[in-house]
């Protein structure tokens, strides 16, 4: 092994990218003066690329980018990204009078920012080993036969697609998680569909997939979005609710609440982000269903609440699913042939759990401080930090883009001390 790293960062998504930006902006220049390495399992930077559906927009303001909430004068703000591509690009965006850019453009912004830090990133490095070496008081990270020593660790592995056991038990390329929706394989299945398509889920991803399929398919090719809830639920994006759950300074309040009160409060706030759909999209979907009945006398493209998939059979070139009602037991099960089953069932933190189990082999859970530090990590000198996985402690916004910049600044301060003010100030001759 080579000389120990001062800091190893596991995972290269918005959380770690915003942290690198905070280090770039830090007055002590840790990127220049310290040995820092990022390890990413993918061959290149990417962020939810499989959901870059044409016409889909971000659900947060572009001002909540990788840098602006921490330092609006940073080079890496979204507005400067636009400006760096020319005045016409900046003017064009401003002329749209929108706070929510397209998902495609925001992904391009993230890739633009990431391209500046390529010398610090080890791609194709799926870190699946993390343990502590007491003899050297260092952490060891590794993938395959390659290992690195590090004094400090930041874990930003993000989330991984979750596929429920029923769907996972059926070995078929016709079952596609929403994270792969825009892949070539998925889009070929969509284009060639004859029997029909089924989307499982009741959140934003499921609704966006249904909408894209609706406009892509023949109007009479069967399409359904099914879920257990009675009806799709609109997301709560009112300003008071946004302030409570998504303003980063409220993490202090959430973290210091008694556990029972905090979990109850977070449960109430699930309608801001989990299994909900933007109201404008729900209105569009309802209108399209109405127009189908008007034109064809029935809905070929359906929204099916109170519906569960009881069984799935793999018939080679298609699937056969049995749909049942959860509440109306008098309703007979329905059998459908489908060409593709899109599973929009969310994500979990499996990669983080694997790393934590290797660091704490005796099933001892990680104790996370308000500053995102693992308090019971074994090193005497170094520290382990986590980001993007502590919503139960810090609040719902902790896993979202809107907190990334502020949290990154806090982590930079924790590891390398406070940064001297670098913001532009008015010239001395001004009053």
Swiss-Prot record:
Tell me which Gene3D superfamilies the record gives.
Answer: FAD/NAD(P)-binding domain (3.50.50.60)
Q: Name one GO biological process term.
A: ferrichrome biosynthetic process
List positions binding NADP(+): 202-205, 228, 273-275
Q: Where does FAD bind?
A: 40-48, 59, 399-401
Q: So what EC number does this one have?
A: 1.14.13.196
Cofactor or coenzyme needed:
FAD
Q: Which UniProt keywords apply?
A: Cytoplasm, FAD, Flavoprotein, Monooxygenase, NADP, Nucleus, Oxidoreductase
- Where found? Cytoplasm; Nucleus
Checking InterPro entries in the record gives: FAD/NAD-bd_sf (IPR036188), Lys/Orn_oxygenase (IPR025700)
Question: Quick one: which residues bind substrate?
Answer: 64, 242-245, 273, 402
The entry's free-text remark on the cofactor is:
Binds 1 FAD per subunit.
Q: Tell whether Flavoprotein is among the UniProt keywords.
A: yes
Any Gene Ontology CC annotation: cytosol
Write out the catalysed reaction.
L-ornithine + NADPH + O2 = N(5)-hydroxy-L-ornithine + NADP(+) + H2O; L-ornithine + NADH + O2 = N(5)-hydroxy-L-ornithine + NAD(+) + H2O
Q: Name one GO molecular function term.
A: flavin adenine dinucleotide binding
Q: Pathway, according to UniProt? A: Siderophore biosynthesis; ferrichrome biosynthesis
Described by its record, this protein's role is as follows: Catalyzes the conversion of L-ornithine to N(5)-hydroxyornithine, the first step in the biosynthesis of all hydroxamate-containing siderophores, such as ferrichrome.
Instruction: Give the similarity note.
Output: Belongs to the lysine N(6)-hydroxylase/L-ornithine N(5)-oxygenase family.
Full protein name? L-ornithine N(5)-monooxygenase
